[in-house]
C-alpha cells in the first residue's frame, strides 16, 4: 500500500519506520524536522504526498488549533482543508481525536 503521512510528531516518524519495515511505500509532508527513515519520500506539498496514495495518515490529535493540521515538526503552519482537498474522494483517513468540524469537512469531500 501507499501511505501519505501528513503532519504529526515523533509518533508519526515511528509509524513511518514500521510501515516501511512492512514493505509499504510512504510519502511524508509537513514533517520537515522529523527524523524519518530512509525510504520515506519527503514531499513538497500535500498534493504530492497524496497523489496515488491508498490511505491518508494524520496525527493525534489531527488539529492543534481549529482548522490547522497538528504539525509541530513542520517548518510552517498548514490548513487541514488543504490536506483534505488534495485527497481523492473515497480515500480512507486515519487520525486521532478528530474534531467534529474536521470530520465534517472530510466527509464533505467524500473521505472515509
Where are these regions (language model features)?
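Glycine-rich adenosine-cofactor-binding loop
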Residues: 3-14, 19, 112
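Structural motif
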Residues: 4, 57-59, 94
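Residues in the short beta-alpha loop(s) of Rossmann-like NAD(P)-binding domains
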Residues: 9, 30-32, 99
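NAD(P)-binding Rossmann-fold cofactor-contacting core
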Residues: 22-38
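Short, well-ordered alpha-helix to beta-strand connector turns
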Residues: 23, 52-54, 90
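Active-site regions of enzymes building and remodeling cell-envelope glycoconjugates
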Residues: 36-47, 107-111
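Rossmann-like NAD(P)-binding element
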Residues: 45-76
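Rossmann-fold NAD(P)-binding glycine/threonine-rich loop
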Residues: 71-112
